[in-house]
Amino acid sequence: MSGWGSIFEAAWYMRGFEQFLMDLILNPEMAHTILKKVTEFQIEHTRMILQAGKGKIDLIFCGDDIGMQQGLLISLDTFLEFIKPHHVALNKVIHEYGSTVIFHTDGSIMKAVPDLMDMGIDILQALQFDAVGMDAGMLKETYGKTLCFEGGVSVQHTLPFGTVEDVITETTHLVHTLGKDGGYILGPSHAIQAGTPAENVLAMFDTALELEP
């Protein structure tokens, strides 16, 4: 696995978060130009990695956080105009080399999933089911035939603050729901936070090893 193909995030790192969000509305020409330049860099960088890998890189990790706890960070229309086309171009290059695209975006993103799929992702990563509207059963039923899922075990509640039994229950639910007929990689809903009980982390993996979807 290689890469971190962010486009939206790389752009706002350069301009500042609030400033770039304002650019999208007040100075769209500049925003488009910055995103285009970032994409050109990411495509060339990714191409060099894949060429150096000589067919041995199975997976490229990309991502742009577009979700918050309550909904999308930017409107879906803004995402479609400014962000999606650039990831389509990047993902096309990744697929040309026979690699798979795993795409990270956490938060409440249900309404964006069809467009994430349309831009060429293969694996949707993070799966923050603590966020509004995120539903494992609906994701699997609606998109599970063509999209793989990774993550889901809560780093906001279950892993840091739950009991071992809570972790076992949640892990079992996710494996049986998202893992039915394959297409699920168990993992936390984001980075495991400092102070998370080690026994809870172990319970997540031990439970998964004992289960069949």
Regions picked out by a protein language model, each given a short descriptive name:
Residues M1-P213:
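Active-site loop segments of alpha/beta catalytic cores
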